[in-house]
Amino acid sequence: MIETDKLATEQRIIAATPASSHEEVFERALRPRQLDDYVGQEKVRGQLEIFIEAAKRRSEPLDHVLLFGPPGLGKTTLAHIIAREMGVNLRQTSGPVLERAGDLAALLTNLEANDVLFIDEIHRLSPVVEEILYPALEDYQIDIMIGEGPAARSVKLDLQPFTLVGATTRAGMLTNPLRDRFGIVARLEFYDAEQLSRIVRRSASLLNAQIDPNGALEIAKRARGTPRIANRLLRRVRDFAEVKADGQITAAVADAALAMLDVDPVGFDLMDRKLLEAILYKFDGGPVGIDNLAAAIGEERDTIEDVLEPYLIQQGFLQRTPRGRVATLLTYRHFGLSVPDARRTERDEWDTPDGK
């Protein structure tokens, strides 16, 4: 991906990844601190309540936890909540940072009893580091090499019992041996508008922003099912309201603010619309191959596949078929277009998920 594409992708207001270190600081201030305050993911939350309480009653570390799902849904927040509910310390790192076995060994040997080690992007661990992790997870021991050459020898170190919480957006990239060592595996799902509305109201309260239920719902409906996006939109709408509406966030104020930001009623921005409009107007609704589509809109193939398409497919606006990408009936309706008869009759032929 060229730098301009990367910059445009990272600066999207509806991007699910953190835009900057400043935004990460802002997110930390809004994070719930206990399970009772955590909105959504009821099934996961209910399971963790049971497992955490059972571990505390037995004075044991919680079993190792794998959290996976799209970015921005609260995996890091849950890791912090787990540590707080267990009453232990949390040590945080990420897969790409742990380049050498010694990096991981230094972390593990400094953990206190029952502490939580949180590894974000755990699918990006190097094979060397992963090999060190296996005995640590199973037996609370690690083997380290001392010395070099013929004089090198392996020394086994005992570790304090601990809980590993791993987070990933790409569970399929985890190796089977690593995945099998997690006793608790939880998938986080996209949030519905009502859940996001509750998150927006809670965040607004923490920010001392005046918002009514309809204003919160308007923001929630455009947040693409993602709390991180909802909180980011809230910040921008709050700015707009303070300048244009005496600080009061109503549905009309939120609508005007988000229209100014080019975020439409279903959460599409200019890049989403550019892709869908290219399929509709340049390729008659599709099918169109990914390389032709990338050339038509001036984006890299990887940007389309990894950044733009997932939400459009998940929401039913785009299909991947063996013959290429196809705009759905929902897309025609969204842009106020009538569906050509040819699209209606050919639709069944394209109704497969694996088109390239």
UniProtKB/Swiss-Prot annotation:
Protein's UniProt name: Holliday junction branch migration complex subunit RuvB
Gene3D superfamilies: 1.10.8.60, P-loop containing nucleotide triphosphate hydrolases, Winged helix-like DNA-binding domain superfamily/Winged helix DNA-binding domain
Region of interest: Small ATPAse domain (RuvB-S): 192-262
Molecular function terms, GO-annotated: ATP binding; ATP hydrolysis activity; four-way junction DNA binding; four-way junction helicase activity
Residues reported to bind DNA: R301, R320, R325
Family statement drawn from the similarity comment of this UniProt entry: Belongs to the RuvB family.
Gene this chain is encoded by: ruvB
Cellular component annotations (GO), alphabetically ordered: cytoplasm; Holliday junction resolvase complex
One biological process term in Gene Ontology: DNA repair
Function per UniProt: The RuvA-RuvB-RuvC complex processes Holliday junction (HJ) DNA during genetic recombination and DNA repair, while the RuvA-RuvB complex plays an important role in the rescue of blocked DNA replication forks via replication fork reversal (RFR). RuvA specifically binds to HJ cruciform DNA, conferring on it an open structure. The RuvB hexamer acts as an ATP-dependent pump, pulling dsDNA into and through the RuvAB complex. RuvB forms 2 homohexamers on either side of HJ DNA bound by 1 or 2 RuvA tetramers; 4 subunits per hexamer contact DNA at a time.
Catalytic activities: ATP + H2O = ADP + phosphate + H(+)
Region of interest (Large ATPase domain (RuvB-L)), residue spans: 4-191
EC identifiers of the protein: 3.6.4.-
Pfam families in UniProt: AAA_lid_4, RuvB_C, RuvB_N
Residues the record lists as binding ATP: L30, R31, G72, K75, T76, T77, E138, D139, Y140, R181, Y191, R228
Keywords: ATP-binding, Cytoplasm, DNA damage, DNA recombination, DNA repair, DNA-binding, Hydrolase, Nucleotide-binding
Region feature Head domain (RuvB-H), mapped onto this chain: 265-356
Species whose genome carries this gene: Burkholderia cenocepacia (strain HI2424)
InterPro entries in the record: AAA+_ATPase, AAA_lid_4, DNA_helicase_Holl-junc_RuvB, P-loop_NTPase, RuvB-like_N, RuvB_C, WH-like_DNA-bd_sf, WH_DNA-bd_sf
Quaternary structure (record): Homohexamer. Forms an RuvA(8)-RuvB(12)-Holliday junction (HJ) complex. HJ DNA is sandwiched between 2 RuvA tetramers; dsDNA enters through RuvA and exits via RuvB. An RuvB hexamer assembles on each DNA strand where it exits the tetramer. Each RuvB hexamer is contacted by two RuvA subunits (via domain III) on 2 adjacent RuvB subunits; this complex drives branch migration. In the full resolvosome a probable DNA-RuvA(4)-RuvB(12)-RuvC(2) complex forms which resolves the HJ.
SMART domains documented for this protein: AAA
HAMAP family named in the record: DNA_HJ_migration_RuvB
Compartment annotation: Cytoplasm
PANTHER family for the chain: HOLLIDAY JUNCTION BRANCH MIGRATION COMPLEX SUBUNIT RUVB, PTHR42848
Residue positions binding Mg(2+): T76
Domain notes: Has 3 domains, the large (RuvB-L) and small ATPase (RuvB-S) domains and the C-terminal head (RuvB-H) domain. The head domain binds DNA, while the ATPase domains jointly bind ATP, ADP or are empty depending on the state of the subunit in the translocation cycle. During a single DNA translocation step the structure of each domain remains the same, but their relative positions change.
